[in-house]
Amino acid sequence: MSTGWHAELELRFEHNREVTRLMRRRHVGPLAVQQPFYPEKDGSAHVYLLHPPGGVAGDDVLDISCFLGRGARAVLTTPGATKFYRSERGQSTQTTRIDVGEGGICEYLPQETIVFDGAKASIGTKVFLSGDAVYLGWDIISLGRPACQESFDTGEVRQRIEIFRDGKPIWFEQFRLHGADPALNAAFAFCAKPIVATMVYAGPADESALHAIREAVGDAARNLFSVSRLERVIVCRYLGGRMSEAKTLFRKAWEVLRETGLGKPAAAPRIWAT
């Protein structure tokens, strides 16, 4: 019998009079949301997803669902890291589903996820786009706690990202790692680097966006950061040893994609500055 939390958060955004409004919110358990902020001229809603316990333990389940109606624009982030704690019990799960209507834009930019040694974590993101809807999101994962010299020696982590447009898959990736997995130290895989990050952009862009991203991150990051394009999906990756570096590089790439793809300047959520 499960002894963990089962928390749910359901949000619905609609475009109304040049502003995106949070029209519905429903939560069960320790998941909540703050009132939206509106720091941008286009009326995009900046929303902070809150999980007051701060961590996820064995058997906990977090289900987040966000729906953006036609023309709605939202930036979703979190005030702090999500932590998956060591547990002798069952798997801890966080699933996020995002539906974006035609003409809508969703930016899903949570702070990092820290998977403690001995944790059993499953992290899944599923995105459904309609028509010309745009998605820009990242997943930044720390395997263990390198700042505390803690490596990921035991436990398990699963990550899965799926993106669909008009019901057809346009992006899919997943990995599953055990603490003793040889891939963690293999030169062809994770190279003993604890910070693994992926950013996916599904929206209008051309090759000039890739060039601009590479220019923004600079040559110093070329062994840690990569960017590639498959049809209308741009993917950035980081594999390295410093969380601050991963965040800095991804924010630079995000700024470029905002300008070249969305046609508007970067407007970082205020919570990132605290």
Curated annotation (Swiss-Prot):
Keyword match Secreted: no
GO molecular function: nickel cation binding
Coiled coil: none
Keywords: Chaperone, Cytoplasm, Nickel insertion
Subcellular location: Cytoplasm
Any one annotated GO CC term: cytoplasm
UniProt entry tagged with the keyword Acyltransferase: no
Similarity field: Belongs to the UreD family.
HAMAP family for this protein: UreD
Role description: Required for maturation of urease via the functional incorporation of the urease nickel metallocenter.
Subunit (UniProt): UreD, UreF and UreG form a complex that acts as a GTP-hydrolysis-dependent molecular chaperone, activating the urease apoprotein by helping to assemble the nickel containing metallocenter of UreC. The UreE protein probably delivers the nickel.
Protein name, UniProt field: Urease accessory protein UreD 2
Organism: Brucella anthropi (strain ATCC 49188 / DSM 6882 / CCUG 24695 / JCM 21032 / LMG 3331 / NBRC 15819 / NCTC 12168 / Alc 37) (Ochrobactrum anthropi)
Source species taxonomy: Bacteria, Pseudomonadati, Pseudomonadota, Alphaproteobacteria, Hyphomicrobiales
